[in-house]
Amino acid sequence: MTWIRKAGLAVGLALVVVGSTGCSYNTFVSQEEGIKAQWAQVENQLQRRNDLIPNLVETVKGIAQQEQDVFGRIADSRAKLAGATTPEQQMQAANEQTAALARLLVVVENYPQLRSNEQFARLMDELAGTENRIAVERMRYNERVQAYNTSRRQFPSNITASLFGFKEHALFDAPKEAEALPRVNFGRPGGA
């Protein structure tokens, strides 16, 4: 092989490596932006839930005044979520809030007069819808993170990820308490 041919092969190989790195880099940038956009949707739903909680708590407080521990935990979880600055802190605070709401639902079941309260029923319907939205947005976020993290670990993209500092993103897992949440029935009198 002549030196011209060797030089041509080296240049060709260098172009392939640079092109591959550039494509991988752009893919990572796009995936990270998608993760950020999806996290914003999760934040929107968490804020929606956070906004519903005071009305729900006030409705329950009027009837179940002796349950101060539960109300305190809910207030703490709202404050933590409001003060969280990173996705990881927000995930932790959201999981604590889910656990606190589960405790509230158990308390509420002990007060049948709440079931007939129209405002309580409306708030519970809104909360149920919001919880479903959070679950959907959490799933979409986790799908994006999983795709990104998988790309980040695959060859040759892992080289680009390492060179340019693309870090692994955390999944937004459901809280451990959610695996064993009690079933609660808030059926309204006379039907549903």
Residue spans for each PLM region:
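A helix-centric hydrophobic-segment signal that preferentially recognizes long
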Residues: 2-192
